[in-house]
Amino acid sequence: MYIYNVTINVEESIHNQWLQWMKNEHIPAMLKTGKFLNALMSKVNVNEEMGGITYSVQYKTPDQATLKQYYEEDAKKMRAQSKPFEGKFVAFRTELEIVDEQE
C-alpha cells in the first residue's frame, strides 16, 4: 500500500472557501478517479513563518503502479481544478510506502 500525501499551505484570506472546496469538490473528485481507496485530511498544528494554515491530505492507493497511472491519466486535470486559488497556496507532494499498519 502507498499513500499519496499532499501538504498544502493556504493563505488565510481564502482559507474558508478553499476548505469547503477541498471537502465538497476536490477530495470527492480525487476518489472518483478510482485510483484511491480513501482520503484523510488533517490540519497541521504548526505556526508557519510564512503565515497561512497548513493541511495534509493523504490518499491511500493499493500500489505504486496505480499511483503512476493517476499521474499519467488524472493529475494534470485534478491540479487544474485549483485555478481559482492560484497564487494563494503552496503545495508539495510526497509518496509514502506503508510498511506496517495496525488497528
Which stretches of residues belong to each language-model region?
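Glycine-rich beta-strand-turn "strand-cap" elements at beta-sheet edges
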Residues: L40-M50, A80-E103
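Short, well-ordered beta-strand segments in beta-rich or mixed alpha/beta enzyme
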Residues: I3-N9, S42-E73
